[in-house]
Amino acid sequence: MSADSLFWPIFFAQYYSALESIAVVVAVLIMISSFDDLFIDAWYWTREIIRKFRFRNDDNYRPLTPEQIKEREEQHLAIMVPAWLEYDVIAQMIESMVATLDYRNYTVFVGTYVNDHRTIEEVERMRRRYKQLRRVEVPHDGPTCKADCLNWVIQAIFLHEQQAGIEFAGVILHDSEDVLHPLELKFFNYLLPRKDMIQLPVASLEREWYELVAGVYMDEFAEWHAKDLVVRESVTGTVPSAGVGTCFSRRALLALAATTDNQPFNTESLTEDYDVGNRLAAMGMKSIFAVFPVDFVTRGRRWFGLGPDLERVIRMPLCVREFFPDTFRT
């Protein structure tokens, strides 16, 4: 048999052997990178099983109920919303928030930039409608980092306290796309001032089955906020802020401001949410990733769009909901 006739069999044999070697290397790398997932799953489910049996056999254990959090006297709470070019959503967000929240003793502070005239107009329109709304002007052009806007909002909150003769027990961070649950402020009010940072889970609003990019975000956030953060809090005792649905106690904000020239949020960091969580942990502040089951009303279309929309009541943790991005560019 000539050498030419053996070329292709030898070539394909070597090619197949190389593919096998590459597959082994890739499999080993995937296995190594999956160890953390295996640890998280093992810790999470072991913890859940232990808690289930412990609390089931504890006659003194009573789950927290919505009625309990509603009974607590309302403290002053502030909501801060940084806004840059949010003119198309900010009014709807404010209207939805005011109509939804089952709470009276709160003030909303929206931070806008001097060169963002369309957002300013929308916020001013809402301010004339709702007495609990304040607009905070960042005195320089935007955009800047989120931390910069938040620091100006915090200064306005401190000034408002002096002028109104009140003290906010907690300050809650939200974005212009957030949809709140009616019991959110009641829940924060119940935990303050015992906890210094309270982080709620973040979940997506309903999406269609074919919105695949948004579906990837939904999967990632579901895994991160339903399991990973629970394990992280259990193992390390620290909780990072998610940038939305985060409540800071007055004590926490004053402590943060005291260490950074009266600017609680670090403008040198692009991940101010992680930064603030780590700084509070270093100060010995008490943080919690709060999981409190409540009822949500969801609406969705029927298969093939036939018939009226479906409305269901589902039980899931109290969370902040929003539409996650649905394009590759975002």
Segments the model singles out, each with a brief description of its role:
Residues 1-70:
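N-terminal membrane-anchoring/stem segments of glycan-assembly enzymes
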